[in-house]
Curated annotation (Swiss-Prot):
The keyword Disulfide bond applies. This is Fibrinogen beta chain. GO terms for biological process: adaptive immune response; blood coagulation; innate immune response. The keyword Cytoplasm does not apply. The modification Sulfotyrosine is found at Y4.
């Protein structure tokens, strides 16, 4: 991820998946 912490990265990926 970019500009995001490792923990945030997981949430971001999940959000993209839900999309």
């Amino acid at each position: 991820a970019t500009d995001y912490d490792e923990e945030e990265d997981d949430r971001v990926k999940v959000r993209l998946d839900a999309r």
